[in-house]
Amino acid sequence: MAKWGQGNPHWIVEEREDGTNVNNWRWTERDATSLSKGKFQELLVGIVVENDAGRGEINELKQVEGEASCSSRKGKLIFFYEWNIKLGWKGIVKESGVKHKGLIEIPNLSEENEVDDTEVSLSKKKGDGVILKDLMKTAGTAKVREALGDYLKALKTEFTTGMILPTKAMATQELTVKRKLSGNTLQVQASSPVALGVRIPTVALHMMELFDTTVEQLYSIFTVKELTNKKIIMKWRCGNWPEEHYAMVALNFVPTLGQTELQLKEFLSICKEENMKFCWQKQHFEEIKGSLQLTPLNG
């Protein structure tokens, strides 16, 4: 069992500066943000839709905000991505020859939604052109979602070249990580594979909490001191959740004046949102603060 500040080094973390493979635990993480932006330009700009009434084309990648990363741990790949994308489109109504242009927005491309459920909104500048707008909204949206699906395939194949890929032997075992703060312990156990659970609607949970300690010490509570004090991405589940249902949790550690701000983002079932807020606040954050009051800053 691990005490606070002596956690298991197997958590997925952003990067070790010395590149050491801790305890021969084969993990790595790659930033796919810049590569993703190039892929969006390649896949989305140039999309054309056409029918007897008009022709539309996505001609500009106006804005891309967000990040993406690929993590590998013990032969398992985990992907984290969150994007807000804005595209410019133009078109022409064939009968009148009138040209129109507008905007396509994808406000939340992330693990929270499947590609087919990802919101794609379309707008058009003032003027008549309902036929063209309808064309872009139907056929155009379908092609945009198809391109987003191609991006996710690339994220999981092209962007992972050189990383440790799952092997047939490793695929027979799932690693279940359970965080138990009540006893200030961390348990890691392997379990046999079971059938995949049914897909359930999810929601993004955002929380921020201030702790009267340094980034280094707060970070060490979730992992080990020798790892970079910045960000942790991990799969997490409650013991009473259905098998194979996990939440993806991202923890960012931001230094403030005399304190550390912990920014938490978690994708989980919609019906679990309020319970998880209570769980993080009461069973995790408050216990950590209580532990910090008994622990000197220098450890």
From Swiss-Prot:
* Gene3D superfamilies, alphabetized: 3.30.530.20, Activator of Hsp90 ATPase Aha1, N-terminal domain
The record ties this protein, via InterPro entries, to:
Aha1, AHSA1-like_N, ASHA1/2-like_C, START-like_dom_sf
Record's keyword terms, sorted: Chaperone, Stress response
Which biological process terms from the Gene Ontology are attached to this UniProt entry? protein folding
State the Gene Ontology terms under molecular function.
Answer: ATPase activator activity; protein-folding chaperone binding
Sorted alphabetically, the Gene Ontology cellular component annotations on this record are: cytosol
User: Which branch of life, at top level?
Assistant: Eukaryota
Which Pfam families does the UniProt record give?
Answer: Aha1_N, AHSA1
Its biological function? Co-chaperone that stimulates HSP90 ATPase activity.
Name the family the entry cites. Answer: Belongs to the AHA1 family.
Identification of the protein by name: Putative activator of 90 kDa heat shock protein ATPase homolog 2
Q: Which gene encodes it?
A: AHSA2P
